[in-house]
Each structure stands twice: as C-alpha cells, then as structure tokens.
C-alpha cells in the first residue's frame, strides 16, 4: 500500500513538474528553462556550492546553445552577416568559379557547414576568431614600424636643422668679429670680399641687395675733393662742404633752406665747371644729391679714391643693417676734432 501510494504520488508529481517546465520565448530566441527550473527547488532546500555551480553551468549552456542556434546559424552565413565574416575561412578570397554558379557554391558551402558537428563548428569559430586576431596584430605591428620610421626621419631632420643653425651662428660670430677689427686693415679685407669697386670704367652693380648700404658722405663729391678743398675741421659751422649747392640740401631736409646761407641754385664752392660735372654724373646715373637715393651706384673713381673716400661708413655691421655708422648732418654743421 505504501509502495502503491508512493508510486501514485510520484505519478501525480511528474505531471506537476512537467507543467512547471516552460519554454521562454524572447524576440524569436527560444531559451529552454528546464534545467534551471528543476534546480531552483533544490537550491531553496540545500543552498550549497554544488547547486550554485550547477545553476551557473545550466545558464551558460543555455546561452551557448542560443548562440549556436542564432549567431552561427547557416542561414545567417548565407545572408552575409557578421558571423559569416568571422567564421568562414575563404571570405576574403576571390572565387575561381563563374558568377552564374556562385549561388550554387554558396548553397553547397551552407549544406557542408550544416553537416558539421557542434565541436567542429566551435573549432571553426575559434579558428576564425584567432585568424582575425592575427590579422589585427600584424596590422598593429606594421603601423608601429611605420611610426618608428617616421620618428627616425623626424630626428634626422631635427639634426640637420641643428647643424644649419650652428653654421649660421658661426657665420654671424665671424661677421661680428670682422666688424670689431681695427680700421687699419679694412681696405685689403673688404676688397678681397668683393664689396668695393676696383675699376673706374663703369658703375658697379651689386647682386646681393642685403650687402648694399647708402653711399658715403664723400662718395658723390667731386673727383678733386681731397686735393682742392679744405678739411672738415677747418670749415666753420655755416660753411658748407665742397660740391654742394644751396638748393640740394633742401631735398634732404624736406625743403628747409634756413640752415645754409646764399641764394638757391648757386654753387658756393665749385662754380659753373663743378655744376657741369655734377650734371653729367647725374645724367649717367652715378650721382645723387641724397645719400639714400640710388644705393647700388658707386661713382666711377679710381681704386684709391674709392677705397679712401668713405672708410667709416662701410663696416659689415652697417651693411647688414643698411644704414651708415656716422650721421650726415654733423659732418656738415659741426667741425670734427683733429686726431
């Protein structure tokens, strides 16, 4: 009786257990909850590590089964989804068959994949993932090598730039040392550098405009200035230098003629002969009343006259700054002290 009652109870218990076993459907994914539902009552009675492990295992099994059914499904591969791109080994190769047979080839491949077992599908899936990781690693290594080459090229360019800057600094220091040299040896060194004209045939034209300075104060005076005219310290403040007319400083001083006596247009020192010479030189383009006009020109004087007429206004530092080292007006208005 007890055995029959126990059997009857068991028979009554089985349908109730089967009724509690349901299938959960969510967005087309059939997740079987049989194992989880059967384990839950046991966990309530005996909550131990074994029961928790069994629940975790059953949950993982359900998730993996859903992934196999819906992610690695052959229909998804046939439709060209991401799973097909990961799993299929020959996705990047160009097909050797004709285009009209491509659909048949895809169908055969799909059938062949469907015939594989679960272990073979998992192995194929892992092989595809490892291949993708290998491709990514190789790409990263190639990028890192290219970055290393770029860094080496940049370092080489920086080294060349440093060498250029050092050479430029040495050049500037040598020019400054030359500018600070005594005036005794200036003609030979400057003539050797090609900064002065040595002939009297034609006017000298400089190719580099950065080395051109304003003409010196005595460069456009008459050729007989050193022979026939008195020195600057013997002239008074009101006596102008030889070779100037009363109206010529007006262009330099902005039209102010109160500084020099005399009538405009009359040469006070040279006379008509000197005025005629200056007109000829002005027509030839080698003379200007202003020291800042026609800077590339040098008067066609002899070598000695050209080298000794303006030594104080032709230092390398002055040529670099393009301005004379001595002022023009003090030489005319103030007597210089004898050495």
From Swiss-Prot:
Phosphothreonine: residues bearing it: 325
Stretches with biased composition (Polar residues): 239-250, 324-339
Keywords recorded for this protein, A-Z: Phosphoprotein
Keyword tRNA-binding: no
Family annotation (PANTHER family): PROTEIN FAM131B, PROTEIN FAM131B-RELATED
Similarity section: Belongs to the FAM131 family.
Protein name: Protein FAM131B
Organism per entry: Bos taurus
Species lineage: Eukaryota, Metazoa, Chordata, Craniata, Vertebrata
